[in-house]
Amino acid sequence: MRKLMMLFLTLAAMTVQAQTAKKFTVNITPDGKANMVAYLPEKPSGRAIVDCPGGGYSHLAVNHEGHDWAAYFNNQGIAFFVLTYRMPNGDRTIPMGDTQQAIRMVRDSAEVWQINPEDVGIMGFSAGGHLASTVSTHSEYDCRPNFSILFYPVISMNERETHKGSCVNFLGKEGQKDERLVKEFSNQNAVMRHLTPPAIILTANDDGVVPPVTNGIAYYSAMRRQGNDCSLYVYPTGGHGFGFRSSWPFHDQMLNDLTVWLNSHKAPRKDAVRVACIGNSITDGHGIDMSDVKAWPGQLQKLLGDGYVVKNYGRSGRTLLQKGDQPIWKEQAWRDALAYKADVVIIKLGTNDSKPQNWDAQAYESDLRLMIDQLNPKVPVLNKKGKPTKKMQRSQKPRIILCTPVPAYKPSWGISDSVIVNNIIPIINKVALDEHLEVVDLHSIFDNADGKAMQGDGIHPTEAGDSQIAKAVLEILKIKH
């Protein structure tokens, strides 16, 4: 029996080695207490996954929730990194910081490790699933993963509906008494529309340690409500902690489900033109189900094809005016838009600025110019000797396109079509002329003659109305791309 077991372990090790070109350990912290073991594939696809094993934030199950997965991923050309993160002992910033640094490190080493920095995912099990979902919902763009794989994840930090030990270890005994903290790190409450990465959740119906309904399913429900890309697989049995154990009856089915999901989420082409759409609720897709796909940026993506990657940075109710009641400048979406380093930026802001409590013509013009400056700062022109002169100019990228607001057919929420027509549009045209920018005149193009292009509030387009916007923007984009 012992000989058979040794033979099995030897064959398993040979399988991993056959698909793994390099295996090494990288320190995340100088003392090596946080580190990750890298498994680089023989034939890299460019995709990478950082793995967070579970263990209730008290220890790590690094085998069946870590190293045992290496051959599966390497066989698909996916670089795999098993993260040893430090335990929080009540300080949540410790494991969060380790994981965020691991993602940064993978992206920073992308060229050397043959990884596409826009195709770095995270995988987590149980408490590691909470950590993975926390980094997916609470991180800035540079260390937020591009997709999440969550196995029987702890999502809630309410000890009455999840694994109590994970809650106490992550937040601390005092933190558990803070309702604000409990809510903030119950990650179904932290899902960001358009910004939280696509996710797949895999759990068992009979999990008695981390109840699916108040955890994994709650995360799925939050993602679906926001119109984000999310898939949910609930297996009939398996309890908690099945991981990569081949003895689990649904092991092969689970691997097939995960493989199909990974294959259906292709990485963006490295040479794809990056497009950022910055706007208010009309860009966000207010009132449109599955707006990530059906709002005008999503429709634009479909029209453009895989030669482009279109990101939706719309936020409902937001203003261009910094002193408006809800300025876009304070939003994660704005920070993401800057960090994205787009090739093309489309700005569609002004509808909410027309409200009486917001409108200020002088400030609107100066804030529009400031936004352009932040997206594409002017730099000194160099002379023949390569030295800077007093003359300033903008770079060719990003190409900035301004959109006028669509008509406001009703004065809902105090929005004024008169202010839009007589004040906002002339300012947009003036700034565009001064800065040599293109304008998409949506106010003139938009057609609601049949009443099917606009929702009942008279402000927000329907899916059909958003189709008009997408096609109008497409026509301008085609001029140079």
Description of each model-found segment:
Residues 34-37, 217-269, 459, 463, ...:
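C-terminal catalytic histidine-bearing segment of alpha/beta-hydrolase fold enzymes
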Residues 61-68, 81-117, 246-253:
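Catalytic nucleophile-loop/oxyanion-hole region of alpha/beta-hydrolase
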Residues 101-166, 182, 187:
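Primarily recognizes the serine-hydrolase "nucleophile elbow" in alpha/beta-hydrolase
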Residues 164, 271-277, 282-369:
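Conserved SGNH/GDSL esterase-like catalytic core that processes O-acyl groups on lipids
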Residues 200-203, 207:
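Short beta-strand/loop motif that positions the catalytic acidic residue
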Residues 208-215:
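Conserved alpha/beta-hydrolase "acid-adjacent" motif
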Residues 239-245, 288, 318, 406-481:
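Catalytic His-Asp segment of secreted/periplasmic serine-dependent ester chemistry enzymes
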Residues 348-352, 374-422:
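Active-site segments of SGNH/GDSL-like serine hydrolases
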